[in-house]
């Protein structure tokens, strides 16, 4: 399940930047944006599954995985708001900030917690 979650995140980030570049070029990115929304669902379902699986086995990291899930949802919210505001030609600065800060938090927690790679 971890590999499916990581693959979904990788595809989600790729689709996000493709949709962003399409909207930036003035072309329609609606199809890519809808594909990205499908990836959001897969990311959330696999993330909840991993959260429940890990907290049933080991309750000592329950809070940290909860914070990681919250940060992951903020990443998804930031990605979606950036694309929606881009499609309407509105300012996206605050949502880029949300996206980047939450993404850094998710990567840090993902590399620190026991399920992820042990870098820190």
UniProtKB/Swiss-Prot annotation:
It is found in: Cell membrane. GO terms for cellular component: plasma membrane. Pfam families: DUF1516. InterPro entries: UPF0344 (IPR010899). It is a multi-pass membrane protein. The chain crosses the membrane at residues 6-26, 32-52, 64-84, 91-111. Keywords: Cell membrane, Membrane, Transmembrane, Transmembrane helix. NCBIfam families: PRK13673.1-1. Belongs to the UPF0344 family. This is UPF0344 protein BCAH187_A1308. It comes from Bacillus cereus (strain AH187).
